[in-house]
Amino acid sequence: MKLLNEILGTKYPIIQGGMANIATGEFAAACSNAGALGLIGAGGMRDGDTLRENIRRCKALTDQPFGVNIMLMHPLADEVAKIVVEEGVQVVTTGAGNPGKYIQMWKEAGIKVIPVVAAAVLAKHLEPLGVDAIIAEGTESGGHVGEMTTMALVPQVVDAVNVPVIAAGGIADGRQLAAAFALGACGAQVGTCLLVSEECPIHENYKAALLRAKDSDTIVTGRIGGTPVRVLKNRMSREYVRQEKAGADKMELEKYTLGSLRRAVFEGDTATGSLMAGQVAGMLHEVRPVAAILDELWESGRQRMAALSELC
């Protein structure tokens, strides 16, 4: 099995999650320079020109591979799909939809296509379309989530397809990275553990909330309505879930979520902002450089795998 770094040309077999409103060109470049595949989150861009600017800034700051994450339900998805070709992006990851209508265009441009899935049946459907790899993301992750855990999902996706599988959700240290390889993954995508990096552009209040978090301090909003999102517990998320269980309609619930991610990221509103974070938030204890986080993640994972091999 080829490791992800051999496929992507990165130092480590690790992808930085393309978090909307967070994963800027500068942040992606920092992650790429530190050995991961940095991703720009197109989902948070207000228009195509903003994405172009971020791609160009990333290119100016790194000579390492990087990519763009595209949310296919975004109203600018068609425009973004063309921009990544025009700007010479090397890797595209996709979520929230089927990338089928764009794959031929991307492949002709030499772009590696890696969709994110939350179920093995989706992976099996996407493989014949010509994807290069698949990210199997468990419900432990922050942001939009499915129902299956990473432990259950990854091996089933590995068994369902013949392309490389990347594990995501619940990975913040070497033990979890080693587990991802044991499940059959060729690498991992991480997001929450990078939110507390020095280079991450989120507000300091957001970082402080992450560092205060304990193991049970996340909650999933929108599960009943079909748009589940994992966030830290706060006034907004608790009230959202309470109203959802009481039968509030979509319009009533939108008053809690409209603009809530931007409030958290840019204004540091930890009461009514959407503090997206995975269940590993309770494992975060300090703000460090991206390079320190990734170096330790890989080295501790390598040591864990070596220790496990001695048991056999």
List the model feature ranges, each with a label:
Residues I22, I171-A172:
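Residue-level detector of alpha-helix initiation sites
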Residues A152-I166, A172-C312:
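Conserved active-site-proximal phosphate/metal-binding subdomains
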Residues M1-P164:
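Active-site entrance/lid segments in N-terminal catalytic domains of soluble metabolic enzymes
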